[in-house]
């Protein structure tokens, strides 16, 4: 009987353990599992070949949309691996837990959440600490971006994990009303948004704010210029049915700024120079991945670098 109990305990211990043995400072692509808050959570880790253990390295979290997966986000929506190689940052694609209907979705808390018993803010914080155990991480340069529901969580993290998040970006995402009501950032926070004017998810009453209101929160909080610089982006792809305007509110506290790319005629999608996307009518005039990284790279937790 004692042997059976011991065996069961051993099985339970193994099932609750992280599979860290294959990372431990190594470079490459890793499908990982970690145990947090009573749940087994998956994520994809990409460490560039340019990683140097003697240098502190930034982290970029890239969050998939509702009903999506980490693998889909990496392979079909926002593959940042080439950027990670050339720009020397660690890339993490976390996987959301599933709601009662089996749909992967990030928990934003509040009365409108579909997964109220899951602590996704704590999960991202856990991943920061976990990866920092095995790699030389620049804790002043932790960035987060996401698509749709992943964009919503990026707002949540900027509000509730502010001490860790240096800057954030949202694509086809908005600020959840509960996030807005409970937001308590602790430092000036640079923010970039990319949204289509034909996105049917923009500002659904009772759930989340229109993107203009979401931007305005951070414009006011960061004390930037109230009048933006506006630039018409070259309509390089004339067959995608859309064009882009760039807005930038500059001169915020500690040099931070708020940038917004308005995709005229664009809908719920992640703009890319490769417009073969299954995520809406994708604009082909801008490279969202590069735009986001170049924005992030200018800032750390203290503001403009």
Regions found by a protein language model. Give the residues of each.
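A domain-start/cap signature at the N-terminus of enzymes
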Residues: 16-59, 72, 83-86, 116, ...
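Flexible "cap/lid" loop of the alpha/beta hydrolase fold
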Residues: 174-190
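Short, proline-enriched alpha-helix->beta-strand connector loops that line the catalytic pocket
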Residues: 186-191, 254-258
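Short beta-strand/loop motif that positions the catalytic acidic residue
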Residues: 193-195
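Acidic catalytic loop of the alpha/beta-hydrolase fold
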Residues: 198-202, 268-269
């Amino acid at each position: 009987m004692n042997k059976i109990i011991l065996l069961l305990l051993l099985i339970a211990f193994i099932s609750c353990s992280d599979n860290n043995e294959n990372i431990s400072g190594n470079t490459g692509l890793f499908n990982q599992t970690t145990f947090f808050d009573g749940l087994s959570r998956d994520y994809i880790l990409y460490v560039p070949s340019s990683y140097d253990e003697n240098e502190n390295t930034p982290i970029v979290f890239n969050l998939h949309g509702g009903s999506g997966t980490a693998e889909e986000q990496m392979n079909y929506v926002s593959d940042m691996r080439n950027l990670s190689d050339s720009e020397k940052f660690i890339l993490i694609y976390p996987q959301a837990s599933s709601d009662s209907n089996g749909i992967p979705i990030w928990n934003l808390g509040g009365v409108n959440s579909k997964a109220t018993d899951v602590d996704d803010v704590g999960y991202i914080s856990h991943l920061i600490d976990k990866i920092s155990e095995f790699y030389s991480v620049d804790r002043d340069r932790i960035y987060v971006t996401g698509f749709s529901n992943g964009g919503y969580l990026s707002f949540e993290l900027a509000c509730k994990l502010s001490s860790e998040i240096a800057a954030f970006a949202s694509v086809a995402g908005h600020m959840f009303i509960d996030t807005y009501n409970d937001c308590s950032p602790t430092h000036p926070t640079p923010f970039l948004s990319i949204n289509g004017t034909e996105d049917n998810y923009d500002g659904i009453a009772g759930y989340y704010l229109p993107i203009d209101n979401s931007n305005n929160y951070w414009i006011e909080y960061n004390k930037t210029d109230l009048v933006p610089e506006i630039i018409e982006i070259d309509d390089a792809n004339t067959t995608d049915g859309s064009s882009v305007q760039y807005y930038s509110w500059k001169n915020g506290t500690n040099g931070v700024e708020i940038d917004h790319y308005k995709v005229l005629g664009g809908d719920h999608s992640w703009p890319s120079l490769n417009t073969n996307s299954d995520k809406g009518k994708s604009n082909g005039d801008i490279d969202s991945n590069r735009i986001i990284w170049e924005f992030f790279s200018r800032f750390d937790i203290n503001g403009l670098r």
